[in-house]
Amino acid sequence: MVAATGHRICNDCSKACIYQKQDPVNIPLIESNILEETLKLPYGLEIYILLTRWNPLNIYAPLPKEPTNYNILVTGLGPAGFSLSYYLLRSGHNVTAIDGLKITPLSFNIHKPVKFWHEYKNLLSERIPKGFGGVAEYGITIRWDKNNLDILRLILERNNNFKYYDGVALGFNITKEQALDLSFDHVAFCIGAGKPKILNIENFEAKGVRTASDFLMTLQNGGAFLQNSNTNMMIRMPIVIIGGGLTSLDVATESLFYYKKQVEEFAKNYIEKDLTEEDKEIAEEFIAHAKLFKEAKNNEELKKVFNKLGGATVYYRGRLQDSPAYKLNHEELIYTLALGVNFKENMQPLRINIDKYGHVESVEFSITTWLDRRTHKKYHINMCPTVKPSSNTVLIKTKTVIMAIGIENNTQFDYDKYSYFGDCNPKYFGSVVKAITSAKEGYEVINKRLIDNVPSFKGSYACFITQLDYLLTSRINKINILNDKTFELIIHSPLAAKNFQFGQFFRLQNYSKDITKLIEPVALSPADIDIEKGLISFIVYEVGKSTSLCKTLSENEKVVLMGPTGSPLEIPQNKKIIIIDSKYRNVGLLKILKENKNKVIFATYPDIKKHKLTSVDIVIINTSPEIAEELQELKIFGENTELIINVNSLMQCMMKGICGQCIQKVKGKQKYIFACSEQNQNVEIIDFKSLKTRLRQNSLQEKMSN
């Protein structure tokens, strides 16, 4: 697994050796150089892959073991997932891996020997993200050669007893119970981290405020950095990053590179059309900054331009030497500072201030005082030193705030049935190296668990995969044009159709070698479901480039349909219900509501405004935030009528809030929800001003791309 680690990824051995008393031998750099020199040789890649199968230095298992016919489901293809898959394949097991992200097929024949690896490599600035590798793909910056991910894929995909399914997530397209029913002998959780932590301060949801996960996933996995990309992500300078871990450093360096690319691309393609006053101000700002970058003749002048514009600054609540970034990999901190990123210590965020457009304009910080551990005997060595907010505050001007303050592990453990690796295992939480270690140290536990059991599936792996291909692969069944801007999209995806409950939705994407034809992740709610035929019907409205591209899909074309995701709608009984939607009825929802003895009325907007509906029990609203807000204010419903809205916020991963883009401010103690997992909400708690503002986060870019 040296292709996944090495220089600037793994430095545990160097740090553990002499604790910085002198310059250590840089073992990871040596390992990376050996791999690099090997790959330069004719058939060097084949030599490396051979050594991953035949390892003469491993005296206990120099060769892969004989086939066991055990079928193991690995859920996730991040560092833990691809490492565990490798060790399980060496143990002789059949490995089927699933990943909720889209994974683009490799552009070359994986079974044909590669003579010169450099002919297959891409420049990192031009490389289209392929989705394989999880956080290794979207969470690590250009400090690491991501072409290595293609090597890791080859190591796995050249095994006849390995198959992966992308756009398939556990608990969505397939459940744990279904996996066991399909004759999997074991399920291994390698699903990575959970939801990002959010600052509990005012205006945390303002325009210009993002989570680090959102920023990195949109940039690296969505390909926002690529020329002509359909992925929109707007950032402005100065940039404030709140946090102190390695992720905050990655965000800081990437934000500088991306900002330059963003404004240069904008200046080249700018057309003034349908712009608001805010759009015009931002456009002038971007064009002026693009000119400054164009005038910079070298890196030193470029660094001066960044400093003039405010640059990127990391703000940490404690001292630099106590920050996770310094403790885990101080070398990365040195590299980051050398690029011109600033690091401010002892800064505790108190409040985010916004301008007249609802966009962040400044952050108020409290300058904290550090309490020396010698004066606090109860201080624990693994805890961050205590910091106490002071009365000293400072106001920092900024136009982008990125929160990199950690993530929550929401995994519910059942060690009797399943095993857990990487970030979803508290023992190995926190880095790529730990994730790989968890697989190396944990695969034998699976082997011991299986040894006394008989394989559940009696046939060959080819037969096993045939049933999975049918159940898990999503293909276009038919496209019916309804009018110029509306069409019906019917997709064949049997297990997804079976698992769907009304109120949930799906994430649709396509595969294309042409980046201009790639569909951004689109959230679609089914209009109807045919479980027997495995068909899911969607009514799609052309409201942007990605939804327009959906119409160009071909029959039998393979697509990514991840889901069903989100929370299902609670189906009541014996109630009077009104569904307010478009003129195209949600046939499936109407049917199931009527089956539960409800009286259902379908209404459109603005026709609904003409009626007095005081006797209605429930109103289900599937419209824009503007219409939903107006309906709430109208006095046409009774006092006890419950108004339920489907919160259509910005979304990206749609995997229970992992990226954090879908954060939505709500009223009450909870303060916010992740709309992709809790999208059906009572209208009373929704902050519509916040929702409408966040939906305009990338407004200017969207107008340009459309």
UniProtKB/Swiss-Prot annotation:
It holds the Pfam family Pyr_redox_2. One of its GO terms (molecular function) is oxidoreductase activity. It comes from the Bacteria. InterPro entries: FAD/NAD-bd_sf (IPR036188), FAD/NAD-binding_dom (IPR023753), PyrK_electron_transfer (IPR050353), Riboflavin_synthase-like_b-brl (IPR017938). NCBIfam families: PRK06567.1. This is Uncharacterized protein RP006. It comes from Rickettsia prowazekii (strain Madrid E). The lineage of its organism: Bacteria, Pseudomonadati, Pseudomonadota, Alphaproteobacteria, Rickettsiales.
